[in-house]
Amino acid sequence: MNRIKIESILMLVAALLSQFAVSCNNHNNEPMTKNTKMEKILFINGSPNRDGNTAALAKVLLEGREYETLNLNDYRLNFYGQTLEGDQLDELIAKMKHADIIVMGSPVYWHNICASLRTLMERFYGYVPSGEFKGKRLFFLYQGAAPTKMMIDAVEYTMSRFADMYGFAYEGMATDRSEAKTLREKLESTKQ
């Protein structure tokens, strides 16, 4: 009888430790929500404002799903061609490789993608082999003071070329809450 109680307690402790380990993997204290497909989702926030409009748009897109937020402002990322110590590009790329779905987000700065996200993308060139991210889905969030059609078209072209070069399946872009809700339908669809 005591052995059955001990085994039951051990099973309960193991289940609690497992749940604790999952919650500890969320280093950014983001709300952990259920991801029905168990795909690993990484949101790369290019905004220096970690809780700003870019993050809010990600919450709309990723509503109801578990995801990790990577704030680029928390990482040292040298510009293309710099060889300064402390660069964390390898760490960023490792996190991206571990994810099934990557959502990149940028505020509109000077009619374009913000510098931190642009730097990450530029650093791929010559460092990451072509096709390295084959099979991973890429979504883009681009928000700001009413981006014009020309700005949206230019960024859409940039993102689709980036995706093509590195093997991502580019799923599209959202610039506001309504578009993020529409893009969520693609997120919820089966892998293409």
Say what each PLM segment does.
Residues 11-19:
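Bacterial N-terminal signal peptides
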Residues 133-135:
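A glycine-biased structural micro-motif
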Residues 137-172:
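Short, glycine-/small-residue-rich phosphate/pyrophosphate-handling segment
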Residues 1-2, 39:
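N-terminal hydrophobic targeting signals that begin at the initiator methionine
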Residues 24-129, 160, 164-192:
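N-terminal beta1-alpha1-beta2 submodule of the flavodoxin-like/Rossmannoid cofactor-binding fold
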Residues 2-10:
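Bacterial N-terminal signal peptides that target proteins for export
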Residues 16-17, 48-49, 145-147:
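Short, glycine/serine-rich, charged loops/turns that create anion-binding
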